[in-house]
Amino acid sequence: MTKDVINDMKSHMEKSVESLRREYQKVRTGRANTGLLDEIRVDFYGNPSPLNQVATLAVPEPRTITIQPWETKMIPVIEKAILNANLGFTPSNDGKLIRISLPPLTEERRKEIVKSLKKTAEDAKIAIRNIRRDAIDGLKKLEKDKKISEDDLKRAEKEVQDVTNVYVAKVDEVLAHKEKEVMEV
């Protein structure tokens, strides 16, 4: 019974760490990354579609993203969508391909980004601690309902804390990696 609670908790904590990783993919670093364009939707035959479903995205150089639409008539639509997304860069096109050149980040902007990364990481840690609290509440309910003994409860609480520490360390690791990536010139 305690294993079910702990496995459920691990699965929720893993989702929190994955969510943090996905959130960090959207953050602009000194390098180009197609993940920056993940949220952009373009009107494709009346349906708002993700950019990667109407074009091929590539990173040919560290500071350049290229977008090659499958239909050339989509170029102005894609350009407009990128400009409307207000991501801080301007697309240029040569009739077949859209190029986005990312300007280098200033030191001040890098520090702002790191501050934002730390806040997002702290939010992930709070989510993990809330999951821990829910797991401990679930274990206490099992003990109250006499489904597990007090000793089992204490052992399970220790295991819950150990697992929580592992996932908090994972969050710190993801943050450190992204912080290094952002501060790299």
From Swiss-Prot:
Q: What PANTHER family would the database entry show? A: MITOCHONDRIAL RIBOSOME RECYCLING FACTOR PSEUDO 1, RIBOSOME RECYCLING FACTOR
Give the organism the record lists. Answer: Geobacter sulfurreducens (strain ATCC 51573 / DSM 12127 / PCA)
Q: Which family does it belong to?
A: Belongs to the RRF family.
InterPro entries linked = Ribosome_recyc_fac, Ribosome_recyc_fac_dom, RRF_sf
Q: What is this protein called?
A: Ribosome-recycling factor
What UniProt keywords apply to this chain's record, in alphabetical order?
Cytoplasm, Protein biosynthesis
Q: Subcellular localization, per the record?
A: Cytoplasm
Name the job this protein performs.
Responsible for the release of ribosomes from messenger RNA at the termination of protein biosynthesis. May increase the efficiency of translation by recycling ribosomes from one round of translation to another.
Q: What are the annotated GO cellular component locations?
A: cytoplasm; cytosol
Q: Does the keyword Magnesium apply?
A: no
Q: Which Pfam families match?
A: RRF
Cystine pairings recorded for this chain: none
GO annotation terms (biological process) = cytoplasmic translational termination; translation
Where mainly found?
Answer: cytoplasm
